[in-house]
Amino acid sequence: MATLRLDGIRKRYPNGMTALHSIDLSVADGELIVVVGPSGCGKSTLLRILAGLEPITAGELAINGRRVNELEPAARDIAMVFQNYALYPHMSVAGNMAYALKNRGTPKDEIRRRVANTAALLGLDDLLERRPRQLSGGQRQRVAMGRAIIREPQVFLFDEPLSNLDAKLRVQMRLEIRRLQKRLGITSVYVTHDQVEAMTLADRLVVMNGGHVEQCGTPMALYARPATRFVASFLGSPAMNFLPVTAHAGGVVLPNGAQVALPAILPEGDAATLGIRPEHLVEATASGEAAATLDVTVEMLEPLGADTLAYTRLPGVETWLVVRLDGAHAAREGQRLSLALPVAHCHVFDARGARVPMTGREDAEALAAQ
């Protein structure tokens, strides 16, 4: 069991490139933190710094309150699970899991006990004598996890461990990782570019962009109250709809002149962006309090079974408006729909991409989150 603390962690390479800009983060004992972001955002560099594989340029890294900046990887009591499994092909499943314990000089009886217990935990009992080439992708990943679990580390680090698996196996292993982490209670940091993994696994989510932490919080808090346009666009599939708007008294104005009544705090005439998620665009007849009603034309439909995605156009606006409809909806291409923008689900972002507080609504959201 362990806590992690990162204070002002910076990583700058000799060529002048800065990969991490003053990262501050605390991870509680037994917590599973997922770090998510696009390629090049710094998430893998952060993981390597935690593991001791990259030196820190500035700042302090502490495990259980102890500074570990200069501590060698082997002395940090951390176990990593990689995307490429990192198994020894000439060793059996049992041999792969026992390897680190043998190197430590652990007694043979203790090794046998831990191998048996770990194999039972992961459902590998019948595979202990097989070689990695005789295993499926999911089985190999379980062996890789077993090799980490058997060491009984203070901290787990996961480096995109499901990237090489097909969609069905990813779902299965996602559930398995979450179950095991909760059962074992080991503090974990999980890096991924997959937002579904991030949303479903995390106790808390850290969204990174360009070496900065954009936002940190519970998955649903970030989904419902993104601090920046980047977070709003990165979380959610399909992504949040964005419309260019101009601030005016009592709300914002769309490029086609339509007014949207919102309690946003923006100076008159400021350029901004209005955001709303596809599932929150509803037909006007089904809406409650609406900020505006938009008449759109359906240009393309994507039936997904339970849902149908409608790609619509609003006159005078170049971007799509994507609407998530019920799968049984009788929408057809070329049809006109009247859509309501519910006030409670509208987001306004300023020219810098920061979320603009809504008068009254922010207080209500803060109280609801307590």
Swiss-Prot record:
Family under the similarity heading: Belongs to the ABC transporter superfamily. sn-glycerol-3-phosphate importer (TC 3.A.1.1.3) family.
Binding site for ATP: G37, P38, S39, G40, C41, G42, K43, S44
Organism taxonomic ancestry: Bacteria, Pseudomonadati, Pseudomonadota, Gammaproteobacteria, Oceanospirillales
Cellular component annotations (GO), alphabetically ordered: ATP-binding cassette (ABC) transporter complex, substrate-binding subunit-containing
UniProt keyword annotation of Transferase present: no
Name used for this protein in its record: sn-glycerol-3-phosphate import ATP-binding protein UgpC
Catalytic activity: sn-glycerol 3-phosphate(out) + ATP + H2O = sn-glycerol 3-phosphate(in) + ADP + phosphate + H(+)
Location of the protein in the cell: Cell inner membrane
EC identifiers of the protein: 7.6.2.10
MF-aspect GO terms: ABC-type glycerol-3-phosphate transporter activity; ATP binding; ATP hydrolysis activity
Membrane topology according to the record: Peripheral membrane protein
Role played: Part of the ABC transporter complex UgpBAEC involved in sn-glycerol-3-phosphate (G3P) import. Responsible for energy coupling to the transport system.
Protein's organism: Chromohalobacter salexigens (strain ATCC BAA-138 / DSM 3043 / CIP 106854 / NCIMB 13768 / 1H11)
Origin: domain of life: Bacteria
